[in-house]
Amino acid sequence: EDYYVANKLMKGFIGSANIDTNSRLCMSSAVAGYKRAFGEDVVPCDYTDLECTSLLVLTGSNTAWAHPVLFQRIQRAKLRNPDMKVVVIDPRETETCTIADLHLPLKAGSDVALFNGLLQFAHNNGAIDEAAIGEFTQGLNDAITSANTIDAKDVASLCGLNEADLNTFYDWFINADTAVTFYSMGVNQSSAGVDKANAIINCHLALDFIGKPGCGPFSITGQPNAMGGREVGGLANMLAAHCDIENPEHRENVKAFWQSPAMPECGGLKAVDLFSAMDAGQIKFVWIMGTNPVVSMPY
């Protein structure tokens, strides 16, 4: 695909990492969250999981408008499985709420408190098999200790939610057979976007809602091909197949596969840094493909 060829040309043959994709401004929080949790930018579920889950959580996403085809798929899944519960977490009552069994209109920016509260609730109600989860994860006790710094009433107050509705959501989540959480720009586009993503991922890891059908923390992209750009290594600090440009072994493997004469040893300028470098006269030539930053990013 075009991203792959452009990235190969720039990094493997021109020898510069000054290339960045729309994934940067769209999905960088999700990328960092996945890398912090799993060691690489990997989405541990796919769209078929929504069709066999017992609980679907939509947070930071007006799916009906932003992902209409996906929303239609959710509607069909709900029609086929009326017992599937849908929770929409959004400060606004959007069209997506028409499919919700429960809408939580939390205060903007309080997502970390909400999901840390869920982790605390799960722990306090004995829903976490700590011995089993501890075999395959690191830091579970630290995460629980951090989550236990506030109680349920404080969470409800911080999030601006009715305590009964909050407890209903928590109860549904810890008692579900399977759970999928879709999160998008309402989570990612934030000064605490990475922490929000990891708070969600932590709940899935702690309750074993990952790595099996109908389960997983799923960051749905906010722009076309924002996932594809990541997979082919189009980000300034990445190489193809989620390889890290600053990892010598990764560099050599990709360089050998490409049979390329050059390979930068460190990440290049990221999108906003590229604009600043252009303004300072440090970048003499720019090739813009498939986007119009003067309109979409008038920095």
Go through each PLM region and give its residues.
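Extracellular/periplasmic loop regions
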Residues: 227-230
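Acidic, Ser/Thr-rich peripheral helices and adjacent loops at domain boundaries
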Residues: 233-245
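Cofactor-pocket helix-loop regions in the catalytic cores of large enzyme subunits
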Residues: 1-225, 249-299
